[in-house]
Structure formats: structure tokens, C-alpha cells
Amino acid sequence: MHKSFIAIAIGATLVTGTLAGCSTSDTKVQNVIAIQTDNPLLQASTLQYQTPDFSVIKDEHFKPALEQGMAEHYQEILTIANNPAAPTFDNTIVAMEKSGALLTRASSVFYNLTGSNSNPALRKIQGEMAPKMAAHSDNINLNPALFARIDSLYNERNNLGLTPEAVRLIEVYHQRFIMAGANLTDEQKVKIRALNEEQSTLTNEFSQRLLRLTKEIAVVVDSKSELAGLTESDITAASNDAKAAGHDGKYLINITNTTRQPVLASLENRELRQRIWEASANRGLSGENETASLVSRLAQLRAERAALLGYENWATYRLAPQMAKTPEAVYSMFGSMVPAVVANTEKEAADIQAMIDKTGGKFELAPWDWEFYAEKVRQEKYALDANSVRPYFEFNRVLEDGVFYTLKELYGVTLKPRPDLPVYHPDVKAYEMFDADGSSMAIFYADYFAREGKRGGAWMSSFVGQSHLEGTKPVVVNVMNIKKAPEGQPTFVSYNEVTTMFHEMGHGTHGMFSKVTYPSLAGTSVSRDFVEFPSTFEEDWAAHPKVLANYAKHYETGQPIPDELLQKLLKSGSFNQGFDTLEYMAAALVDMEWHSLSPDAPLQDVATFEANALKKHGLNISAVPPRYKSTYFAHAFPGGYSASYYAYMWSEILAADAFAYVQTQGGLNRDIGMKYRKTIREVGNSIAPMEAYKNFRGQEPTTEGLLNRRGLKQTL
């Protein structure tokens, strides 16, 4: 997942409702400066590429830096908006690109840490700042004088003698200001400000509750015997987690961010499997940290906001600037796949039920049984035991000999450790990226291990964005939640985690390879349904024979994974794809249905709404619930993927088509890798996404590659 923190857009004032307000008083600005001279966030870091100096940044620095940043930024915006000179590209658009340096710097660090290394102090600041940041965004986006200048330039954009990238930037600004409400009446602007403030407050509260829920719903297990099926390493980790949580002598199973839980594939105790699954699936429905009420209200207020802006619903509003363009296009894409996906899923369910019956189970398949018995089916069908593969996927080897190796083979880049650079947690490692000619390109932070204070999932984000205009090079981070082994033991990753490591590096290189002039167009600043293309494309290299042979080696002997075992692993790649695809589609369509509500629709009962949405689309298979239920659907509600979770599959169509094309061009080689790097990853949003894709591929994508990738084509 690409995590687009608001800091990336602040300098360009291209945010659409998640920034905030501050005083416009010059005296206030001067007073804040006088008081905060010892705050390291007030000046650009002197470390390479302005990498944040985490050794001196403290929690108490953030709030004053954010408030001063907003004050300075707003003064800069007023200067631009009230400039008596006629609007030009330089005195308006370029000036906006250069504005908000302090706010960008402070917020990029702050919002990265609230996601990956949060604590009560940071969460308190986050709650206080949310409505202020929303107001600040509105103060910019709804400024009539500022929009008049942008509108004037937009109308004359093709007559100004500008570069194609500069014209593209004007178009991006204009569209985002329109979609933020810049051309609304004064009365409508008052209403949209109120809705933006409420949305900001609710999404922040949603995130905070999800973080608290992660700790609250962890399952305490009394005896080791109940954990039969887990490895000794996993049991030791569960014991250590329990001790850290104050449950000495017991075991703790932490719940991940998805409905399905990895531990369910190994646990033999059916009653415990049910406890764990229900803890996951029922989170947020009730209790002090319930999120159901937030889901209903967020869907409602987003519909109200869309109506103010002249759209039928939030989904229509959100998709207008995307590649998909309309909700109907998304429904059509999924609808065309439902028959194949359901057919695969029903066959998988029948195979699993047969395995339950064969092994003496006298019960019908339930959601908490799927993964446990699916693993048995996998072993029988492919003679593949997940534990037999495990010793060949040691974390460091996967990262260095898999992910980093692929980057060098395809794109000519290398990453070297930078232990001298400060990090925000001992588990984080810093690297410097070098191009084939030895020139330095970027700083990369690797934050792969789960810990308290980190939200669930995996994502990429930026501390510093690339820009020729400002002379900045990228500083990016990849974040995951891999379970770290106890001290002194190697950390192993599942094959799913292997592909996620490749996926997030796809986002990372999208940021680090960026070569554009303007920061607002850099790297991952593309549409939601294009941003997942580079990352999904990168996933497929994890299974490339040459790449696998380089990293899939036994952690003790260094011997490569036996060819027989490797072939079993590769052949099993399409196993359970009905389940995997259906649970994703279910979540994506529930997201789309929530955000297709009309503005006059009443508040919805979450469970009833979900059930009706799944039934409507023919995905109501009880043993296969959505990957995320609404109450913990971070992408769609507190995150930036509302009415956009479909984007993963839309992007996968591009990725599968592109990867198939690459194989016709020799596969893993520098020539095709550099073509892809230059036409896709270096250009950011300086070129329209489909135009960039056709520059690489020579044509628009088809769905054939996707169906082959997921092993679904044979069922059509």
C-alpha cells in the first residue's frame, strides 16, 4: 500500500480536506519563532538529503512546529493570492510549489511516526491537530482570489509557452481546487468547511480506536497445549508477547489488520481458532472502541459533501479524476469476474469440506476452518508443507538477495547500509541508494517488524519528496508488520510476506526513481488506481526462477531450495485464488456500496448493510467474509482509499499485462528494466497515467494477464 501522508501535498497546497487552520497574524508567527528557536523541525535538517535527525526530534517539538508551519504557510498563500501583478506560472503555481516548507517538513515526520511508532503523546497531538489541519486546507482551497489566479492560468495554459510538465501541473492544480470546492458559493463553502472538519475529526478518532482495538482484542491462551500446530518459535513469541502484556505464564495471539489470521492455518484447536476469528471479525462492533457509528456517519457526511460539489454520491466524486472514471466501470470490471471467482471459490470450499470429512471432522466448513484445512488440501494436492519451505525464507536474505538483487538486475541500482543515520526505532535500518554510475539517488528506511504503536498492514511513505525545482532527493520508508523472532533466532517470513516486501519496494522505487521538476507531480503522486501498478508489478519478480534461486536458500546451510520443493511452491501459486480474490472483491464492493449512498440516505446498520451489499453482488459465501469488514476497514474509512479499494485490482490488470509483456522482452534484464524505469517510475504524475503506460507497453492493457496471474482463466 502507498501511504500518502498529507505532508507530501502541503507544500503545493493540493490537499482536499485533511489539512488545517491557524492564525494569520504576523505577530503570532514572530512570537512562535521566538519561543521555538531550539526546535529542530524549524530548520531543514543538515543530514544528507534533509533526512530527519531523529536523534534530536522529540514529541513536544511537533505541535509548535505544525502550528508555526501553518501560520507561515498561510501567510505565503495570502501573498500569492493578493499579488497585484497579473497571474503568471512563476508568481502563482511555482510560488505555491515552493510554499509551506516548514509545514511539509514537520508533518512528514509527524504523520509517519503516528502510523509507525505512535504513543499517547503523539496521538493526543494528532487529535488536537486534525480539525486545525482540515481548516488550514480549506483556507487555501476555498480562497477565491487564489483560485481566480489558478483559473486564469488554466484557461490560457496552452498559450503560455510552457513545458508539457508545467501544463500538466496547472491542470492538476485546477482539478483539485475545483474538487475541493473552490467555485462554490460562500454559503456552500461554510457548509463544506463544517463537513471537512467533522470528517477530519472522525477519521482521526477511527484511527485511534483501531490502534486501541489491536491491543484490546488480542487473544489470551492459558496453556501451551492449546497451541498445538504452532512452531516452537511461534509459541515462544506468544509467551513473550503475553509477558509483555502482563499475562505471565500465558500466551498471547495478536490480531492482524485483516479478517483472516495467519495463525489459523496452523492451529489444531478448533475452539481456539473460532475465538481468534471472532475476535478479528467482530472488532469495532461494540464496546468503548466501537467504530460502527463512525462508519455510518462517515459514509453519510461524504455523500453530503459530494452533493455540495455537484456529484451524485461520494464514489462518483472520488472516481472522477481516476483512470476508472466512474463507479459503473468498477462494477463492470468486478461483475465480469464474479462468475469465475465464485466458481473457483465453491470448488475450493468443496475440496476443503471433503478434507474435513476425510479427517474425521463432523461439522460444516466455517470461516475459522478455511485456512487450516486449506493447508491440508494444499499439502495433499501439491505435497507442499508450509513449514518445509519456511527455512528457505529468512528475512535478511529475502531482503538483500531477493528484493535488492532484483533492483540491481532490472534497474542497475544498489542499496548500501547507512548505520550512521539516526533512526526512530532500533528495528529501523537506513540505506543509501546508488545508480549504476555510482551517483547517489536517495535514502531508504526499512521498518519491517511489528511492534506496539504501529498500525497494522504495510505501506510506503516519504520523509522528503523529489523535486528538481527545489533540488531535493527522495527520502522514503517501507513499513511492514513482520513478526520478529525472539533474540538470537532467525526471522522467517511467509511467501505472502515475501511478495509484500517486493510490493512495498515497488512503491519505494516509484518514489526513489522520480525525476520531475515539480514536487506535486513527483513519485507516487498519481491516481489511486495507478499507484498500485508499480508495486504489484514488482511482486511478480519474487517468483522469477533466477530471483528465487538467489534468495531461497536454507538459513543454516546456504543450500538452495530443492528444485522439487520449488516447483511445488510455484505450482501451488494459484491455489486458493478463489478465496483470495473473492475476499478482496467483497471488501472492494462493500467500500463502493458505502460510498454510493445518496446524501439523503439515513444512517445504516453496519452488519445489515454489509450483508445486503454482498448479496447484491453475488458474493455472500458465509465461509469467505470480506478481507476487511467495515468496522476495521482502515483503507476505506480513516485512510485515503474511500471508494478506491478497487484500485488494487485495477492496478493489477496493468501490472499483469506489463509483466507478461516484459517476459516477451527477455524477462529479467537491464534493457527492459530501464525502459520501465524511465517510462513509468521516473515520470511520476508529469504524464497522464494511461499515456505513460502506453509509452512503455505500446498499447492499452487487457485482462488476460490478470486472469492468468490468478489462475482463473480456465474457469471462464
Write out the residue ranges for each language-model feature.
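Active-site-proximal, well-structured secondary-structure segments within enzyme catalytic domains
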Residues: E165, L169-I170, T201, Q208, ...
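Short His/Asp/Glu-rich catalytic/ion-coordination signatures at enzyme active sites or charged loops
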Residues: T46-H61, F110-M129, S152-A194, N254-A292, ...
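Bacterial signal peptide processing site
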Residues: S23-S25
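N-terminal helix-rich structural modules
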Residues: Q30-T231, T236
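Bacterial N-terminal signal peptides that target proteins for export
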Residues: M1-I8
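C-terminal, non-catalytic "cap/extension" segments appended to globular domains
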Residues: V29-H61, Q68, K250-L252, E380-Y382, ...
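Short pre-active-site segment immediately N-terminal to the catalytic Zn-binding motif
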Residues: K483-F502
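C-terminal motif of bacterial Sec signal peptides marking the signal peptidase cleavage site
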Residues: T18-G21
